[in-house]
Amino acid sequence: MTKKNDPGISCSMEEFLGTDEVESVTSNTSWALKERLSFKPPLCDVFRQPFHLLEDTGEFKFHVHPEARKHLPDIIENVVQKIAGNENPEETAKQQYTKQRNIGIVFSGGPAPGGHNVIAGLYDAMIRANPDNRLFGFLMGPDGILENNYIEITADTVDSYRNLGGFGMIKTGRTKIDSPSKMKKAKTTCLTLELDALVIVGGDDSNTNAAFLAQELYQDGVQVIGVPKTIDGDIQVRDVNGNSLCAVSFGFHTAARAFAHNVNNLCSDCSSDVKYWHICKVMGRVASHLALEVGLQVHPNITLIGEELADFIDQERIEKAKKEGTTDYTAYGMTLRQVSRLICDGIVRRAAVGKNYGVIVIPEGLLEFINEIQVFIIKLNTIIADYNNTHDTDFHSQFPTLEDKLEYLRQMARMSRENRMFTVWNTRDDDLFNVLPDFFQEGLLTERDSHGNFQFSQMETDRVVMGLVEDYLKMLADRGVYKNGITVESYRQTMEEGGLDPDLYGPALFRDYKPDNGFLLVKESIVSVKTLKQNLVKEEVIDPDEDIPKPVETIYKQSVPKFKTQYHFYGYDGRGNDPTWFDCTYTYNLGNNVFSLIANGATGQMAAIRNLEKEFKDWEPIGLPIGSLMHLEERMGKLTLVMERALVDIQSPAFSVFAAKRDRWLAATPGEDCYRRPGPIRYAGESEDARPITLILNDLGSDVRPGDGS
C-alpha cells in the first residue's frame, strides 16, 4: 500500500479506499469477534467420555397434575435421568449411540444469549458420534416446522456463530403449535424429513409445546427434547422436597449483566452531575428475577421486587378491621399509593443529605403484583363485558373519551351507595381509580384483546408509578417535608461572604440548627419566600420592613429540590447481547446433553444442568420430565395445561441478603454512594463472573434456617 501519511508519498482517495488496510480496519469481523468465535467452552467431565448412557433415578419426585396424566399418557411416567459417561459400552448400546440420525432444531420465542451454543454443542456431539449425522435448523421459529422451511446446518454454519448472541443463525418466532391442524403439519414435516428427533429451544410455553409434540409424535418414533431458554429466569425446577434441578434458564445471566452494566453507567452519571433520578425498567413481566439480580450486581438506590409487594400485609388496616368486626381483604398486597410512598421516602431521605439524585430499578411486570390493579382489571373486564352483552353498541363506541368512561363509572359508584347488593364498582373503587394518572386510567379502560383480556404489555409501568411519585413529592414539598440538605460548610461560607453571622440566622432557618451537624434542613414551615420572611421576622432576626438578606434567600433557594427524571428501558439490548462465560458454557453443555438424551432414546424430556449454583466442576447434566412440570394456569381466559413459571422466592438467601442491604444501598447518609461496578461482559478471564449472584448467594445460604440471624 502507498500510505498517504508517509513523507513525500501520496495517493489518490480512490487508491486509499481500495487498500487492504482500510478493508481490514472497517471489516465486519472485529478482533473481539475473532476471539469470541475461537473460544472453546469447557465440557462437563461426563461429556469427555466417548459414550454416554442414561441412568433413571427415583431420587426426585414431582406432584403430577391429573390433567397432565390425562393428556400426556406416553411420557407422563418419565423420570429424572442422569447422564453417565462410558468408555466402552456393550455393542448394542454402542450401535444405538452411533447410528446415523437426522435431527431438527428450532428456536421459539424471544432471543436469549447462548442459543447458538446449544446448536454448537449438539452439532459437535453428534458429529463425534457419527460424522454422517445431519442437523436441520427450522427457520423463523415454529413457522419453519409448519411450513417445512429449513436449512441444513454444517460445520461452517456453526463456526460462524459460536459464542455469539442472538438467534441469527436460524431466526426465531412466537407461533405456537397448539391446534390439531398445526400438530398435523408438524408431524408431516418431521416424517417428510425422516427426523429421528426434534429439539425445541424455548421458554415455558415452548417447552409445553415440546411435551405435547412428544406425545403426538410418540407412536411415529420421533423424539422431542426441550431446552430451557428465557432471559426472565422464570424456568426453575425443584422437586417436591425442594431439591434444585434447574436453577435458572440460559440467557438470564447475560441479560442481567448487560442491564447491570448499563444501569451502573447511569449510577456514574447521576453521581457526577447530581441532578437526575434515573428510572430503569428492566424486562421481566411475570417474575422479578432480573430486577433482583441487577440490584445485587449494581446496588441501585431503590430496587422494587414485585413478589415482595404482593406479599405485603398492612397490619394497621387488619387491626382496624378487627376492631370493627370485619375483614379487610384489601390489606393484603401493597397498593400503588403505598409503592409511591415507599419510593418517595427514599428520595426525601437522600435529598436531606444533599443527594437529590439516584437510580431506581423497576421490574417490567410490577403492576401485575399490585392487588388493587388486578382487582381493577377484573372489575373493569366484567363491567365492559356486561355492557357489551346487554347493549346494541359496544362500551368503547358508546363512551369514546376518557371523561365519558369515568362518568359511567361514577354513575355505577352512586348505584353502589343506593343499592348495597351492587358491588361491581363502589365508591372506594372510584376514589382509588381517580388517584391514578390520566394516561393510566385510559390504559386500564382501553379495548380488550379478542379474548376479552387486558393487554398488560401496553402499560408503561415505570411512568405509572413515577407519576404518582411526582404528585406526592410535590405535596411533600408544599408541606415542607421534601428539602435539599445544606452542608454546614456551604451555609457558613455563603453567610460569611455576605457579611452575616451564620449562628444568628441558623436557628431561624433550620429545624435543628447545630454548627457541628453535617447537613442542615430548612424548617418545614418555610415553603416560600413569603414564609421565609415571616419566620425571620418571628425569630426577630430582621424587622418587618426589612428585605430578606440575599445570602439567606440564596440558602433557601438551594434547599428547594427540583425533581428531574430520565427514563430507560432495558430489554431487547440484553437479550441480544453476546453471552457471558456462564451462558457460553451452560448452553454448550446443554447442546451436548441434548444429543446424549437423543442417542439414548429419550423423549418428552428437557435437557438441564444440575448444580448451576455451584462451581463448574460440580455441574451435572440431567434430563427432566416435562410432563411432570405441568400445571393448570389461566391463559387467554381459560385454564390451560402449561409448564409452571418460577417467581422470586422472598424467603431465599439471595432475597434475604438483598433485603438486609438495601437500606445501606439507598445511601441516605452523608458520604459516598454504594454503587457496585460489575464491568462489561466477558467470556473469559479472572474478572468474569462465574455465575449469577442470586445463584451464588442461594448456594452459600442453602444451610441457613429461615429466621436465623434476624
Placement of each model-derived feature along the sequence:
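N-terminal glycine-rich phosphate/adenylate-binding segment common to multiple enzyme folds
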Residues: 3, 12, 21, 175-220
